[in-house]
Structure formats: structure tokens, C-alpha cells
């Protein structure tokens, strides 16, 4: 969080393995989702209970329905408990008459310790199939399968890739105990990656989603670690003199930008992913911090007070102009925490407005700025992998919560713990 700063390639199979072995313990504190706003135009869809689903330990269709509703783009048509297999084709006219523009039927079959899940998506207006999938998963992977089904439906009907099968990282605090946690995108299935009596901040996902870089104070000073979520092993990648903070991965996963005070005032540096090859990028008499790579890896956006107050700047990472910065934000007197959308078109950041800190997005092509929230303590923005939502931390009703808002500001979600606080969110990449 910037306000505190001023004060002080694997395959899908490996991903599935990650979900099984990442944790050193299962978190007891799960995030709960509350819809605070929905899109103005919603797609009515009927998702029947899958044949054979009642015999398995996970309610797949309930997860699919919840995923789609949470996106703000869908409304569920009541199926009144109907059980419909993936074949033969259902009576689409009957579902159309109930108000459904799309319909999903499916079948779950158990084969030993594995489950085959087949489903088919239909357009009720055209009376035709839009395709489907056949997934084979173990018992511990059924939630993932449900998210994958929701992703398929979302992409077929909306046209954008879904992010339901992605993961979140965040830091919870209960009493004096901090935990770095990894959960499903809906906040369910939380796993503990690290527990500490000292603060953990600034988690950042590697592009392939198998590692998280973060800052830990367990050595009584900020040190940057990289945590391998598959093996559970971690390594120090920056423990220079002074503060080591704000890790950010390059898009190719080979480099990590960090903010270091080793030479006096905090500046932006770059190291290889194993901690070797330290290289200084900025050379100013100001505080330069919070680096964030552009999607093509050619630029870094960062926060600097070189103009007298914190603003966001951009600099090339290579070539003769490397380290030469240009100011990006001009609206507002205090702007921090830059994050660039996956398509490189939007910049999310936190702006101080009066005494409040609010999430804004700036169109990088024309400089237009839009406020997205009505809360006053926003921090740590992070784009979803499809660029359609931004996850951030804030306070609602006196509670520290996570929130997600669509980039048009129409759809909002609140994710909170029943006890303790939750902060420092980061939205993980697409599964590869």
C-alpha cells in the first residue's frame, strides 16, 4: 500500500496438481461474496441439475450458477429442480417460454476415483447447440471443473474469456497472526501458503500462476521472497540493505522489479527471478516505488514524488531511454498504486480525493479518467486476467474487506471474512 511506503510455463495438469498440494494447511477463514451491484443488461440462463450430480460430493451446477451471477452479466432462470442430461437435446421451446435465452444440461458419471462431467450449452432462440465439454476430474478437482464450465459458458455467450477458474491471493490477519492465502476466484477453497507473526504485504503472481512473490517482515525488515506454490519451497530474491519492497513480475516471468532503498532513497531495480543480476532502473532524488510492468514488458509504470507529490510515471525498461520517465497521471494531486490492464489500454490506480482514497481507471489512449467506487479507503488494485474486473482492498461498515468492480463500474462484489481483516489482494493469471 502506497500510503505505508511514504511512511517507511506449466500446463493445466500442473495447475491441477497445484490445487492439490499448494497448502501447508487449509484456511479456516473463507471469504464470503456479497453482490453490491449488477450490470444493467443480464443474460437469462437456465442451468438444469446434471444427471448423476446428486451422487457426488460437490454441487457443480450451484457453483456454475453462482459464478455467472457474480459476473453481473447473467440472471438465473429457476429450473425448479429439473434434472436434464447432456443428451438427447432438451425441449428448448419449453425453456425459452420460461424466459431462458440459453440452457445447459449435463451428466456426471463416476469411474473409480474419477468423475466424467459432460455438459452442453444451447441457444433457445435459435434452437441449436453452442457446444460443450467433457471433463475428467478427481474428487478434489470438482470445484475447478465447475469454474471451467462457467468459463466456457461465459466465453460462448459474452465473447470474453472467463476468469472463474483463476485464483486470488490475499493476506488475512486474525489477532497477531498473518496468513498469505490462496483461494478460488469466488473466495472459496482457501489454502494457507504462509503463516507469520510479522506482516506480509504485496503478493504478486508469476505469469504462469505457479509462484507468488511477496514481502515479509519476519526478519524484522522487509525482504522479498518468491514462494513456489507447487513445491511449497520459497527463496529470498531481494534482501538488500534497507527496505526491499513492491515486487512485480515481468510478463515473461524471467525478471522481477522491486523497490529498494539500498543506496539511500527508494528507487526501482530489477532482478532475475532467482534473485541474481541486480540492475538499477531509476536514478532520481525522489522516492520511486510500486513498479508495474506493461503487458509487453517494454515499460514499467511506477509511483514517484519527483514532482512534489506522488504521481504515476512510465519508463522504458530497455534501450538508451531505459529509466527515462514520463508522467502519466495529471488529474488529482495524489495518485499511487499503478496497475495496467492485460490489454494495455487501462491504468488502474488509487487517487486521494479530499481525505478519501478511491479507485480510478485512466484510458491510456486519451487520458480520460473514471472513478469506480463509492468507498473511501481503497488500496492495492489488481486486474482480473481478462481485464474486465479490478480486485482491491477497502473498508465497508468498519470492516476491512476485498471488493471487485467491473471496469465500467456497474458490477460490484464484496468479499469479506467473518472474523479478522483481509488486505493485499492480487488476482491470479489464466490457467495455462
Swiss-Prot record:
It holds the Pfam family TolB_N. One of its GO terms (biological process) is protein import. InterPro entries: 6-blade_b-propeller_TolB-like (IPR011042), PD40 (IPR011659), Tol-Pal_TolB (IPR014167), TolB_N (IPR007195). GO terms for cellular component: periplasmic space. The Tol-Pal system is composed of five core proteins: the inner membrane proteins TolA, TolQ and TolR, the periplasmic protein TolB and the outer membrane protein Pal. They form a network linking the inner and outer membranes and the peptidoglycan layer. HAMAP family: TolB. Belongs to the TolB family. This is Tol-Pal system protein TolB. It comes from Ralstonia nicotianae (strain ATCC BAA-1114 / GMI1000) (Ralstonia solanacearum). The gene is tolB.
Amino acid at each position: 500500500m502506497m500510503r505505508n511506503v511514504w511512511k517507511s510455463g506449466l500446463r493445466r495438469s500442473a495447475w491441477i496438481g497445484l490445487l492439490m498440494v499448494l497448502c501447508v494447511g487449509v484456511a479456516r477463514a473463507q471469504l464470503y461474496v456479497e453482490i453490491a451491484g449488477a450490470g444493467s443488461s443480464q443474460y437469462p440462463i437456465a442451468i438444469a441439475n446434471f444427471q448423476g450430480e446428486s451422487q457426488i460430493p460437490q454441487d457443480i451446477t450451484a457453483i456454475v450458477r453462482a459464478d455467472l451471477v457474480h459476473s453481473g452479466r447473467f440472471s438465473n432462470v429457476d429450473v425448479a429442480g429439473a434434472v436434464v442430461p447432456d443428451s438427447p437435446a432438451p425441449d428448448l421451446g419449453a425453456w425459452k417460454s420460461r424466459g431462458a435465452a440459453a440452457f445447459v444440461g449435463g451428466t456426471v458419471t463416476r469411474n473409480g476415483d474419477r468423475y466424467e462431467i459432460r455438459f452442453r450449452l444451447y441457444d433457445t432462440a435459435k434452437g441449436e447447440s453452442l457446444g460443450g465439454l467433457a471433463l475428467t476430474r478427481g474428487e478434489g478437482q470438482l470445484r475447478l471443473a465447475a469454474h471451467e464450465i462457467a468459463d466456457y459458458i461465459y466465453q460462448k455467450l459474452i465473447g470474453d474469456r472467463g476468469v472463474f477458474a483463476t485464483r486470488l491471493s490475499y493476506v488475512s490477519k486474525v489477532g497477531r497472526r498473518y496468513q498469505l492465502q490462496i483461494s478460488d476466484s469466488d473466495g472459496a477453497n482457501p489454502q494457507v501458503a504462509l503463516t507469520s507473526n510479522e506482516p506480509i504485504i504485496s503478493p504478486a503472481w508469476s505469469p504462469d500462476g505457479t509462484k507468488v512473490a511477496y514481502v515479509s517482515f519476519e526478519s524484522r525488515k522487509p525482504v522479498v521472497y518468491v514462494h513456489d506454490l507447487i513445491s511449497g519451497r520459497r527463496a529470498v530474491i531481494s534482501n538488500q540493505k534497507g527496505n526491499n519492497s513492491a515486487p512485480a513480475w515481468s510478463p515473461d516471468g524471467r525478471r522481477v522489479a522491486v523497490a529498494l532503498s539500498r543506496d539511500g532513497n527508494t528507487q526501482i531495480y530489477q532482478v532475475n527471478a532467482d534473485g541474481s543480476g541486480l540492475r538499477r532502473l531509476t536514478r532520481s532524488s525522489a522516492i520511486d516505488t510500486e513498479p508495474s510492468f506493461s503487458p509487453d514488458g517494454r515499460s514499467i509504470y511506477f509511483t514517484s514524488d519527483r514532482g512534489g507529490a506522488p504521481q504515476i510515471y512510465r519508463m522504458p525498461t530497455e534501450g538508451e531511454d531505459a529509466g527515462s520517465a514520463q508522467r502519466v497521471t495529471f488529474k488529482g494531486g495524489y495518485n499511487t498504486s499503478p496497475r495496467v490492464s492485460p490489454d494495455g489500454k487501462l491504468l488502474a490506480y488509487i487517487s486521494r480525493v479530499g481525505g478519501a482514497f478511491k479507485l480510478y481507471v485512466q484510458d491510456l489512449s486519451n487520458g480520460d479518467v473514471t472513478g469506480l467506487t463509492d468507498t473511501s479507503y481503497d488500496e492495492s488494485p489488481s486486474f482480473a486476467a481478462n481485464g474486465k474486473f479490478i480486485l482491491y482492498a477497502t473498508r465497508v461498515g468498519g470492516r476491512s474487506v476485498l471488493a471487485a468492480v467491473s471496469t465500467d463500474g456497474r458490477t460490484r462484489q464484496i468479499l469479506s471474512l467473518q472474523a479478522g481483516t483481509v488486505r493485499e489482494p492480487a488476482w491470479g493469471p489464466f490457467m495455462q
